[in-house]
Amino acid sequence: LKREKSLPLLRAWNAVLIGIFFSFLPQPLLSDSGTPLRITAVQFQVRREYYSSPAAFTAAADELVRKAIREFDPHLIVFPEYTSAFLSLTDVADQLDESVSVEEGIEILRDSGVSIKNLHQFFYEKGGETARLIDAVWGGLAEKYQVYIVGGTYFHAEEKGTVKNSAEAAGEEAAARSRGSLYNRLAVYGPGGDRIYEQDKVYLTEFETELLSLEPGKPEQSSGLPIGETRVVFTICRDTFFDDWDIRHRGADVWIDLKANGAEYNGETRKSFARALPVRIAESKVPQGITVCLVGGFLDLFWEGRSSFLRYAPGNPKVVRKSRTWDRGELLHITLEASPCFPLEDR
């Protein structure tokens, strides 16, 4: 009789223990019930000291991710173009004064004993090490905080194969390019810590083609990815001015533009921004868009721009939120609308 009376109590106690056990397990990032995706855009301010060592960059990134989670509890955190690109310089950043030009920086490194013929060769030879570092930083943070992270872009190196007769190459630059390719690549990390998506910039700038000898990606490799029930698609800076993605991205739920505007943010630049993602949103009818900007400077390079969130409206997408500044770091947050701004069949 005593045993029979103790069974309900035992079952209740077991239920409590099971509940406590499962409360310590990682919870699903998004439910299956159509939870609106929460996104924080990091208007990242470049500082030379961030790239002085892997530990310094990791600490800076960790602080920003923690701040985003503390203030907004996002599912997805997005960093802009070039955020990870200068991680290739962690061994030499302290030797480079912020006021010198890129060309002067190369000479300083040569004088200090660094073997560097040109920027393409330097970033290509650092490519494997940089990719591993990026995966460790962003993959580690995504797993640590159980979020999705777009770690900006970096210069991705791919081997082309052995050059049989490098003497036939016309100069050092051509020889370097014949050995391997560099791409401006974005990478997305999931809460498991793995890289789950990547995409290369297609329409390169003069800086990227002439100084870095980057090669373009392909629009057909820009499919985006699902996060929960939300299809997220991307373009990288200058790509957003071109209509290649209007049909390709149609049907997505949110379009994210990773931008590094290397010019003063003045009236003309504002008009340029208006010809980028707002036009793509209007043409593709993607219901929501995000532009996330790099700001700050490194060597004689500088970047300015205002990050913003857009919502589709016939004829002219509406800016629903934008950063307060164009030259300082900020966090900008939005919760995507749970339902499209118009019937799905109209897209």
What kind of region is each of these model predictions?
Residues 80, 197-199, 320-324:
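Short hydrophobic alpha-helix segments
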Residues 133-150, 240-332:
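CN hydrolase (nitrilase-like) catalytic-core segments centered on the catalytic cysteine
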